[in-house]
From Swiss-Prot:
GO terms for biological process: methanogenesis; methylation. Keywords: Methanogenesis, Methyltransferase, Pyrrolysine, Transferase. Pathway: One-carbon metabolism; methanogenesis from trimethylamine. One of its GO terms (molecular function) is trimethylamine methyltransferase activity. Catalyzes the transfer of a methyl group from trimethylamine to the corrinoid cofactor of MttC. This is Trimethylamine methyltransferase MttB2. The keyword Methyltransferase applies. It comes from the Archaea. It comes from Methanosarcina acetivorans (strain ATCC 35395 / DSM 2834 / JCM 12185 / C2A). Can form a complex with MttC. It catalyses: Co(I)-[trimethylamine-specific corrinoid protein] + trimethylamine + H(+) = methyl-Co(III)-[trimethylamine-specific corrinoid protein] + dimethylamine. The lineage of its organism: Archaea, Methanobacteriati, Methanobacteriota, Stenosarchaea group, Methanomicrobia. Pfam families: MTTB.
């Protein structure tokens, strides 16, 4: 199995790290997964995908649609899948490298169906619409710590009226210069996505392949199923050169074993089956190893995402991805709380820290509330601060002759302070420096209006939406892109 410069259970991050498994434990998860891929196998609903598996040596039962994937095909797929690829932005300064064992990045959550809006000191929850996507894209374009944009909510105003998913493709691309990751693609419409990206590049399909400003996510159905839609997203994404994220959403105790190790086995089988399909379709296709796997709360009947288990599973998935030499994309910075409050801060910090310290390549969840059903722009800018502080903690403490600062200690001597030292003045930005989180004493805070964090965040959201400028797409090119959306709408209405 190709490790692609990634060492089992180890992240090449510099600073503080979290290692959950020994190499033997990772191998145990792998070999258990190989057993499951042969017995019972994976149910593959798509005839084209079953044919691809069959032509490459898999045992396929056409009555049950069950495919049994031998280990040699898994190993071959892992050797073919790239350990590194670049997510292009419309502005290349936002290009993001996804690399096994590489840097940790963050993106916003997706995909919710409601917006939590702050109005006159209170929160109101409403259905999400296309304009919300445009606003969140603009806000993410401004944020320092959101590296690329994932579809945060659905354009529910287009549900049943037009090609909703195609609107959800152009609107983000037009409203942020960062890379766009479509979390809710429709397999039969991937050609429209390709055409939109190709139109952005003036019709140059080769350039669109080399510099992908667009990528897609699909979810196997737990336990152990690949739907027609999932298969078509994988197959077409591979053929069109779009990075594809195979992300399991297993729930331990519900759609996977109650033991977290057993959940990792079914999770691994689901994700690897999708990755094998991608590599059988187009060797070298760009793929993530993805996770939104969590627990099933047997008492509440919900799938919590602000839980310690989600953080642990996401960290574990990061380690499995490193073991396989694949970039990872995992849930984190997540919350079950309904509004930005104390519970939210606790849940988000915990679920952000664990996968970050494990070296996940992308952590998605910023802006999310209510177990992933709701999105808040105020929470997004608060999460921007949380992520910044987590990044600072990840750096650890450097020990060197310079940082031990013996000369400075001797120069200042006993009972004095270090404020006047040139070294201190030069490193004024060395300590963590959140934008919104308030570190003043009570008197100064009260004198400035006694505003809580939600009010401050709302002011920042309002200011950014009013004043931040996103680099525009050329008018003629945008017209060509819009024409493709119009064509998709027409086809939807005629169908």
């Amino acid at each position: 199995m190709a490790q692609n410069n990634a060492v089992a259970g180890f992240s090449s991050l510099q600073g503080v790290e979290l290692n959950l498994f020994t190499i033997d434990e990772l191998k145990a998860i792998h070999y258990a997964t190989m057993e499951v891929l042969m017995n019972p196998g994976v149910q593959v609903s798509d005839p084209e995908a079953r044919q691809i598996f069959k032509e490459n040596g898999c045992e396929v039962d056409e009555k049950t649609n069950v495919v049994k994937i031998p280990e040699y095909l898994v190993r071959r797929a892992l050797q073919l899948a790239p350990s590194r690829f670049v997510l292009w932005g419309r502005d290349k300064k936002y290009n993001t490298v996804q690399e096994a064992g590489g840097k940790v990045h963050w993106t916003c959550f997706g995909t919710g169906v409601k917006m939590c809006k702050y109005q006159s000191g209170k929160y109101v929850t409403v259905d999400s619409v296309e304009q919300d996507i445009a606003d969140i894209a603009k806000l993410c374009d401004w944020t320092e710590n959101i590296d690329y944009f994932s579809l945060p909510v659905s354009a529910r105003d287009w549900a049943g009226k037009g090609a909703q998913d195609v609107h959800e493709t152009l609107t983000p691309i037009a409203n942020t210069a960062k890379h766009y990751h479509h979390i809710d693609p429709v397999g039969e419409n991937v050609e429209y996505y390709r055409d939109i990206v190709k139109a952005y590049y003036g019709g140059d399909e080769e350039e669109a392949r080399k510099k992908p400003i667009f990528s897609m996510l699909l979810c196997p159905t737990s336990p152990l199923e690949l739907s027609v839609n999932a298969c078509q997203v994988i197959i077409k994404g591979a053929r069109f050169g779009m990075p594809v994220n195979v992300l399991s959403m297993a729930m331990s105790g519900g759609s996977s074993p109650v033991y977290l190790a057993g959940t990792l086995v079914t999770h691994n089988a689901e994700v690897l089956s999708g990755i094998v399909l991608a590599q059988l379709t187009v060797p070298g296709a760009k793929v993530w190893y993805g996770s939104s796997t969590t627990t099933f709360d047997l008492k509440k009947g919900t799938a919590p995402v602000g839980s310690p288990e989600l953080g642990l599973i996401s960290a574990a998935v990061a380690k499995l991805a490193q073991f396989y030499g694949l970039p990872s994309y995992v849930a984190g910075t997540o919350a079950d709380a309904k509004i930005p409050d104390n519970q939210t801060g606790h849940e988000k910090t915990m679920t952000c820290f664990l996968p970050a310290l494990a070296g996940a390549n992308t952590i998605y969840g910023a802006g999310m509330l209510e177990l992933g059903m709701t999105f808040s722009m105020e929470q997004l800018v608060i999460d921007n601060d949380i992520i910044k502080m987590v990044k600072k903690a990840m750096q650890g403490i450097e020990v060197s002759p310079e940082t031990l600062a013996v000369d400075s200690i001797q120069k200042v001597g006993i009972g004095n302070n270090f404020l006047a030292l040139k070294q201190t003045r030069l490193l004024v930005n060395y300590p963590s420096d959140p934008m919104l989180i308030d570190r003043r004493m009570y008197g100064d805070w009260a004198a400035s209006g006694s505003k809580d964090l939600a009010a401050v965040a709302n002011e920042k959201v309002t200011d950014v939406l009013k004043h931040h400028e996103v680099p525009p797409i050329d008018t003629d090119i945008l017209k060509d892109m819009q024409a493709i959306v119009d064509r998709a709408d027409k086809a939807f209405k005629e169908s």
